[in-house]
């Protein structure tokens, strides 16, 4: 499916809705991205889910922070239909196959997001593993400590 790519004001992107599944931002990566941006390097668009009112950031927290740090006012974004919950679900698998590698703590947090949710925790270990980009064994270990 093809989604609209649009330049969004950074101030229009919601980053405070629990859609960041990393434990913390990597300050070195943010700095590196900011330096590259000032040199004209073009980054892929961030991914946001738009519910008609808010643009919920699902993937691209380091790029958004780097953009803010260098004083940019906008960023290219891929706009997908959906709400905060959709963005949160998407975010658990963000960077599983590309971008800044996730730490083991990041992976555990992604799985925990699903296991702590009333609906999502009913899903099979396989489904959660596939969505989070981790092994089924990892999900099982977190589900049954």
What are these regions (language model features)?
Residues 1-80, 91:
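Short, charged/polar connector segments at secondary-structure boundaries
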Residues 80-81, 142:
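Residue-level "edge-of-site" marker
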Residues 52, 83-84, 145:
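Short secondary-structure capping/turn micro-motifs that flank functional sites
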Residues 97-145:
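Alpha-helical interaction elements
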Residues 29-32, 87, 91, 110, ...:
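Exposed alpha-helical structural elements
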Residues 26, 85, 104-107:
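Generic alpha-helical segment signature
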Residues 17, 37-41, 96-97, 115, ...:
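Generic secondary-structure transition motif, activating predominantly at the C-termini of alpha-helices
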Residues 82-101:
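Basic, amphipathic alpha-helix used for nucleic-acid engagement in HTH/winged-helix/SANT-Myb modules
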């Amino acid at each position: 499916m093809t989604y609209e790519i649009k330049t969004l004001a950074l101030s229009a992107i919601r980053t405070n809705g629990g859609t960041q599944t990393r434990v913390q931002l990597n300050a070195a990566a943010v700095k590196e991205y900011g330096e590259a941006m000032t040199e004209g390097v073009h980054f892929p668009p961030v991914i946001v889910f738009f519910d008609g009112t808010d643009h919920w950031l699902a993937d691209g927290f380091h790029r958004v922070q780097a953009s803010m740090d260098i004083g940019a006012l906008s960023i290219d974004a891929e706009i997908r239909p959906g709400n905060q919950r959709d963005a949160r679900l998407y975010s658990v698998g963000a960077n599983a196959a590309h971008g800044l590698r996730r730490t083991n703590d990041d992976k555990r947090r992604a799985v925990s997001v699903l296991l702590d949710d009333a609906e999502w925790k009913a899903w099979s270990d396989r489904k959660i593993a596939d969505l989070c980009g981790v092994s089924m064994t990892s999900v099982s270990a977190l589900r049954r400590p």
